[in-house]
Amino acid sequence: FGSFTEGLALPSMETILRQRFGMEVVSPSVRVSKNGQHLEIDVLAYTNGQLNTAYIVEVKSHAREESITQLKSILQRFRRFFPEHKDKKLYGILAAVDLSPELREKILQEGFYVARIHDQVFELDIPDNFQPRPY
């Protein structure tokens, strides 16, 4: 079911990543293995140059507290797997079909963007004054 949700999220998340955040490269389903360690990223987006930023999107059908921990772990391990991106600002986005208001608040407090599905399209669901936390 996970890849169905990821497939559902990709078109609208790609639009958000390119139009709102200026990402040039958007890669779904990135899997990396190094020295016996593995990292799986639902969507990796980045741009070089002046922005020099990367976004990692974790897609969930039903977001839970563990979803926050999982996204944090991916962000913390990212530079070991992608040393070529070590100087980029790095942000996380949790995209979910089902998400409680309480969990949404926790995700925002962690400095992650929240994306939710609305009319079969994922949209960012963040307050106007939201400040993302770089990792």
Question: What does each model-identified segment do?
Answer:
Residues 1-32:
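Acidic-basic catalytic patches of nuclease active cores, encompassing PD-(D/E)XK
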Residues 13, 41-47, 52-65, 71-76:
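Conserved catalytic cores of phosphodiester-cleaving nucleases, focusing on short active-site segments
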Residues 16-23, 77, 81, 110:
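Conserved, well-folded catalytic cores of nucleic-acid-processing
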Residues 20, 47-50, 79-86:
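Alpha-helix termini
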Residues 22-50:
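Active-site metal-binding core of divalent-cation-utilizing nuclease and nuclease-like domains
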Residues 54, 87-91:
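Residue-level recognition of the N-termini of beta-strands and the immediately preceding loop/turn
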Residues 67-83, 92-98, 102:
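Short, charged, amphipathic alpha-helix that recurs within catalytic cores of restriction-modification
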Residues 90-135:
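Domain-level recognition of nuclease-like catalytic cores that cleave nucleotide substrates
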